[in-house]
Amino acid sequence: MATRRATVPEQQQQQPSSPGSEISKNKDGQEQSEMVSPTEEEGFCWPGPKSVALRRASEGFGFTLRHFIVYPPESAVHTTVKDEENGNRGVNAGRPRNRLEPMDTIFVKQVKEGGPAHEAGLCTGDRIIKVNGESVIGKTYSQVIALIQNSDSTLELSVMPKDEDILQLAYSQDAYLKGNDSYSGNAQNIPEPPPICYPRTKPAASVMAQPVEVPPSGTSLTKQQSSRPVRTATTQPDRSYRVEIQVPPSPTDIVKSNTAVCVCNEAVRTVILPSEKVVDLSSNRTNRAGPLHRTEEVRYGLADPSMLKRTTSPPSSTPSVPMVPASRQFDNAGVIGKPPSYGGHSESMFSTRPSQAEESPSPTNHYASPGSHQQIDWRNYKTYKEYIDNRRMQMYGCRTIQERLDSLRAASQNTTDYDQMLPNRSSGQVRRRSTSHDRVPQSVQMRQRSVSQERLEDPVLMKEWPRSASQDTLTSLTVAPRNHRSESWDYLTRKEDFDQFIVDTQSNGEQKHNYKWTGFTEQDDQRGIYEIPRQHSFHMSLRSPNYTMAPLPYPSDSRRAGTRVLAPARPLQKVHPDLKTIQPTRNFQNSYRSPHPRPAVSERLVFPISKSNSVKIPATYASKPYSPSVGSEDGIVKDQKAVNYIHVSGPQNFQRKPQTESALGFQLDSLKTSTSASSSSPAHTKPAKQAKHSTATSQNVDGKKTQSPEANAGDSNSVLTSIDQVVLREKPSPGQQTSQPIRQPSYIFAVSDVEGASDTTCWLPNDARREVHIKRIEQKKASGSDSPGDSLASIPFIDEPTSPSIDHEIANIPASAVISISVQPLPTITTVPPSPTSPVPLIRRHFSHDHDSIRPSILEVNSKTERSKSCDEGLDDYKDEGKLSLKQGSSLKGIKARENVPSSEDSESRKDSSSDVFSDSNKEGFLYFRQLTTEKGKRVSGSMRPWKQMYVVLRGSALYLQKDKKEQSGHSSAQSDEEQLIGINGCLIDISYSETKRKNVFRLTTSDREFLFQAEDRDDMLAWIKAIQENGNLNDEQTDQASRVLISKRIKEYNTMMSSSSNKSEQSPKPSRQTLSIRQPFRATKPEGKLQSPHSPKQESERRLFSKDDISPPKDKGSWRRIMKKPFEKKPTTGGTFGVRLDDCPPAHNNKYVPLIVDVCCKLVEDRGLETTGIYRVPGNNAAISSMQEELNKGSTDIDIQDDKWRDLNVISSLLKSFFRKLPDPLFTNEKYNDFIEANRTEDPVERLKTLKRLILDLPDHHYETLKYLSAHLKAVAENSEKNKMEPRNLAIVFGPTLVRTSEDNMTHMVTHMPDQYKIVETLIQQHDWFFSEESADEPITAVQEESTVESQPVPNIDHLLPNIGRTGLSPGDVSDSASDSAKSKGSWGSGKDQYSRELLVSSLFAAASRKRKKQRDKPQPSSSEDELDNVFYQKELLQVEFQRPDKQNVDKDVDLKANALSLKDADNIKGTNIIKEDKLEKDIMHSEATSPCPPKLSEPPIVNHRLPPDDKNIPQISFQMEESMSDSGTMLSTSSQASAQRSKPKVVSPELKGSDFLTADVSSITSDYSTTSSTIYIVGLDQNLISPEVQSVAESKGEEADDERSELISEGRPMETDSENDFPIFASSIAFDRQHRSKVEEPTRNVQVNSEGSPSCTEGSITPRMDRRRFSSHKLIECDTLSRKKSIRQKTDSECSAESKNEETLSDAQEAVKKGRSLSIGDTTTNNEPEEPAWRIKITERLKLRLKASADDMFGIGSQKAQAAETRKKKNIRRRHTLGGQRDFAEISVLNAWKINEPSSKEAELSAVDRLKPKCPSQDLSISDWLARERLRTSTSELSMVEPEEKRISDATSQKEPASPSPPPASSPSQVSTAIVTAGSESPSQGTAPPPDDQMNGDSFQSKNKNNFSPAVDAHPHKLSGTQVVRSRFYQYL
């Protein structure tokens, strides 16, 4: 060992030094051996082990050992557990357990280069099988290390080479897990472990059952064990855990501390007050242990082998679990089934066949098949596996870990025997640590948990272990061997009463020991099932590897012996809840375990003393801390208890432990129960297990947990000696204990007695134990560590569920610092430091503030549920009533320790209180203060008890509340409040969760009053608590008395409350004001804690965050007032979050003005949902949303975002939306709603933005901040629109109506203001930085800029969202989709509010769908403004077409329309003349002369031509009406009705009507671009005249469906891939083109539109034009069939006259575009909006491509669909959301048709192409687009060649051809129509020249077909008839 030590100060070297480590090792080793899988055992033949002779060098042997604990298969463990449950707990039962018993395998961790080991050929990974010829099987790790260290100059090792080591092979990874500190220390001669026949059943079972947690590196043994919670894959699956435990460097030193060991007999509970001498404790253990644990004496430098031997309680002591004689438990290589190989030898032997003394300590998990359950001697088994299995069977029975855990759970649920609990614990506790782990002191490895944590987490574990031998022996556990190994403790427990639970502890790391004697489960123990707090303590010790450290402080045997000795003496009786409460071990384990995952480090290293706790903790640690099943308290308590109990182990160490416990929270409870847990370790044991476990556990915990293993060994003794026995109060989980143990006065006395416990080990009956406790309390008082303080200190802060947190483990903080009642605890901690490792964990435990981060996690997890409870419990249990169960104390946070005890361990408290623990600690600062009760004890009403910011000065035993800071104040100036003096003597102080939802609030309960104080943060709160506790506890006697009174009162209240309201809430007792306050906090916060689960540090931390943020006092009083006000206001609403004013909503942590729900939801979405497609668009599950709302309304401000229910982002987003929807006062407030709407309608974009910003700034703080926050969030979401498809418009669509609304549901507003709502929200999202920036001087982005920004995004048709901005101008930004349309119509086109309102209605109806569609279209389209342009063009075209239609409803009119369209194109080209053109167009339309000499004017109609089928004026009018209806119905029924009315009226004035119709169609197209485009396309594709209104409506409905699909696709973030632009980039471009044209056309046609629509509706077409455009999309498409026909005819004539050249150019451009994929550019060219043309061409081209794709698809679909029934069309329309593209596609098609008209041959090709496309269309949109592109290229090429001649022909044939080309245009979207019209206009001439006959044939015949098809029959199948014919004819023409 010296060599190892020197070479690698790792486990072997170091661990031998720690007796505790040894113990852990032994236990672990045994357990491991037991863990060997039976299967391996039988068929396994060990290759002969290799013998290596090492010569000791100056540095030692030059190798380090690792302790690897192999756990039995769960099945085996389960069997054992079953056996135990069946009553097979005798030695025989124990034998089966041997196979279940974790096997300590010791393997070479490291070989020093050039060292003796290296020279000898010892290799890393060699498993030690024999040391000097002595098998390590049955020896604990510490024993093996001791053997090695004690070896002479030469060391002969029999090792199993790593490659041959089954265990290592099985646990190749686990065996070498990190985090295991090598053991350093001197191990005295460690006697060989007694034969495996030891009835380790219980302890081994526990160990085995417990998943091995890898102890932190701090504790080599425990660490290793903890570090390997791995089941051997090769071995039986049941062998769930194998842990490599590194023995702490100096467990031996720790071992020396005296520990009060309580031996738990079934019948009698005895407290062993170990003398300070480790040897005595060891001797006690040895006595108990008997020969079996003889070897453990040797471990870790225990000079006295007999000492090392643990006295095992008689088997009878273990009721149902076969109790291994003390010798087995102690001597058997540690408690329970771990081979006593210290350096891993024992384990390695267990792991491998005894014959193979594999040097490599990395054992593989071998679960020896159950062999003889009699004496399990490895020599008796052929295979190591078999041996281990048998041993495991003996130890654990056949139970698997899971089985044991299950039985443990059952035990915790049922007040079952500890034996049963043990199995349950084994199986139930996820966290398990082999005994070695548990024994190995884990200074920092395991996170300690406060008692409350442990209660929350492992009440069952705690309960299951009465006081585990380790815990009981914790006093002796301080002895290095014990300290070294929690296992030793476990052995004590196993061998004694603890065999049951010890085994579990090892397996779990929280050993779930059914008390073999009693058969009580640990849970039962917590419930008070067993009267043996000591057992429980030992159990706790076993549970947490922390006890591993405890063993270090104590000789493992003595530790075990001490613990065991008590165990046999007292039966495992159901401990009174008080007793249970008193059981610090449990508490300690819980605290120890608390947040830590059972990494060996924390568990075993943290508290050597709390070995059993440590063991217990391991279970809790790895898995238990988060496993509420065991019971929140128990879970927490286990870890904490490990620490606490370790404290309990050493009387003085326990003092430390109590402090630690206070830090741990549960430890506080434990200590509190014991009052002087440390001092009264014996006393603690004597009351129940308190003294025993408190002392032993505390010491061990301190020594081991805090110290490194070596330090633990050394310090453990000092810890035991020096640590006042801190009675660690266990906190039973709120629901776990059937009866919460109420600490009996004896417990309290015991706590107090902890100090007074005599150093000498004494066997005391329960009464004697109580007396000892009292003595110790007295001693503690004498020593200055007040027993009351200790007990209170032992009470964990309510917030410190994580008292065993790493912080505690790491930081050696005096318990006093942690324990507000630091009088006792501080000395305890001071004493503990001898074990450096131990002190850290101890301190961590003691200092809940050290655990703040962790403790809050667990505490919040648990402490919300039972934070107060644990604190109060601890306080009550410790201070007032030892009787109080930890649970009660826990639940009674008011009862909690004296004011100082609960939660005063905040980091600041640490700073303040640590130094001031025993002196008047003056603290001052601003606190928010509220008086809960008056002097009469009456509750102050909420109104009478407002939160006030006071400058609080703590002087002596009084708090002075001052209005202003008279001295330094870290807080904001105190609010005015008379200076008050609050006497804090004997006050109870705890963290308040129920009284207020505020965070960082602590409750100060004096004899007559109760106050709430809110600190700025948790640290400050804890500092205050600590300081108050310290000052309040200055007079220990008075404080103790007062505290007891208060605690009694609190307990009564709590009991009353609990009786009335069930423990689960852990609400404070109802009875008194205090109770009420407690209860309320419990209701409000504890459920939250529960939700979070006591075991979840994350949840706790989050909860803390929330708590902090929510309650951290704002620096300003007003904020504080609001925050304070909110929680209270919410209280009435039960923390209502939904349906309450923003002011009343729980504030976010970081912003009091932002509701917590908003903050949480936004953060969750930002964290996880920014890339979620359709986030906020896709609704969440209503049930989940409702459930979450109800939960939040219940006051659950602590949101566990890790909860599965918070995983569904859609639910979260829906929850957020629901929150805003349910706000009584909308986010934009009812008061300012109209102002926002009006501001949004401001035409000047800049002024609009400024006005909006002014209004936003005028919003109330909460509304403003929330809006700011939400806008930033939505902005972040929109920034990821590429992935989530939620552009600002989509988000605005989602949130606009939700945010911008009035409380009263006004449908009119909803419809009319929807665009404004969308626009406002969209603007906020887009302009968030500007709106919420402090720089108001900056000019807002202009509307055009905004529109461009919008435009940059594929904006859905949020015309209503962007109407204001869009209306401001027709810039490309304006053109951005609906926004630009609305902007145009609104701004550029004129205010047109009527139109705007109507448009808003329409757009609002269609917004969602159209937006989505447009988004996708826009996505292909660089900007949505193109769509607007297209809309404009469509409007222009529509106007022109309409104008033309009135003139010519006949072919001539169509020709005129075409000419007009061409002229419109020209007009588009000439924007300046657009108005004139429009007028001319009107005239032309009115004249309906194909020769209207206004080609420029008609140049726009060409766009229309695409849209307008050459129909008679009547038909066009009808079609317009129908279109309006359809487009309106498709786009917006209201709009359609309006449009229909208007249009039908204007139809008389065909130009206006048509203009409006076109506008309407345009609007529809816009809308339909999003929502009704498909229907519009169908309609457009079909001449509306031909299409009956029904068909139109059907088509529109189909279009709507398509829109819905598209919107769905969009919401899904998927591009609309049905028949749309998406499929066809051309269509998309055409859409863009159409929009561009629309915008362009709109500009010229604004007046026309105004006229056509009626100036109000069309007013400058700003809104109406948008509406019209949308309508025109549908109407255009529909009417464009007629109009386009008419116009095409007219325009063709016109174009022939005037626009042929332009048209030719346009056609050439269009053809080129088609060739280039810029088919839309043709429309642009045709449009002649040259400035926009290039970009528009590109975009339009893209759109055309998309649209052509869509149109081709739509056309094919239409062709087929037209033939199909209307519903079929609907289906296809649905499929054709593309219909947007489709409309435009028709436009494009019309362009193509124009081109095709130019090329008759291409027409045929088109037919073939169409045929090709038809099959492709439905299935292959891309192929269609490609095909369209190809066809276009062909068409464009042919058309280009034929352009000029065709143009002439077109003019001639325009009348004929136009109808044909228009039919395609109807299919195309407005932009397509415009393009088609343009192309038709421009191409019409060319087509007229070249293909006129064909086109005419196709067009005319097709038009006739279309018209005929458009007949009602055709309408019935509009897509099929008109679609097919129109699409094909036009499409073919186009092709």
Swiss-Prot record:
Gene Ontology annotations for the cellular component aspect, listed alphabetically: anchoring junction; cytoplasmic vesicle membrane; cytoskeleton; Golgi membrane
Chain positions of site Arginine finger: R1177
Name of protein: Rho GTPase-activating protein 21
Major localisation: Golgi
Residue span, PH domain: 920-1033
Biased composition (Low complexity): 441-451, 673-685, 1059-1072, 1376-1393
Membrane topology, from the record: Peripheral membrane protein
Pfam families: PDZ_6, PH, RhoGAP
Biased composition regions of type Basic and acidic residues, renumbered to the chain: 863-884, 1097-1119, 1691-1705
MF terms in GO: GTPase activator activity
Record bears the keyword NADP: no
GO BP annotation list: signal transduction
Domain called PDZ: residue spans: 78-163
Role summary: GTPase-activating protein (GAP) for rhoa and cdc42.
Keywords: Cell junction, Cytoplasm, Cytoplasmic vesicle, Cytoskeleton, Golgi apparatus, GTPase activation, Membrane
Cell compartment(s), UniProt: Golgi apparatus membrane; Cell junction; Cytoplasmic vesicle membrane; Cytoplasm, Cytoskeleton
Species whose genome carries this gene: Xenopus tropicalis (Western clawed frog)
Biased composition (Polar residues): 217-237, 348-373, 413-429, 708-718, 1345-1355, 1525-1543, 1646-1662, 1872-1889, 1898-1911
Alphabetical list of PANTHER family matching this protein: PDZ DOMAIN-CONTAINING PROTEIN, RHO GTPASE-ACTIVATING PROTEIN 21
Region (Disordered): 1-46, 212-237, 339-373, 413-456, 673-718, 862-919, 1056-1126, 1341-1393, 1411-1431, 1488-1510, 1525-1548, 1637-1665, 1688-1733, 1838-1925
The Rho-GAP domain, residue ranges: 1140-1332
Keyword Cytoplasm recorded: yes
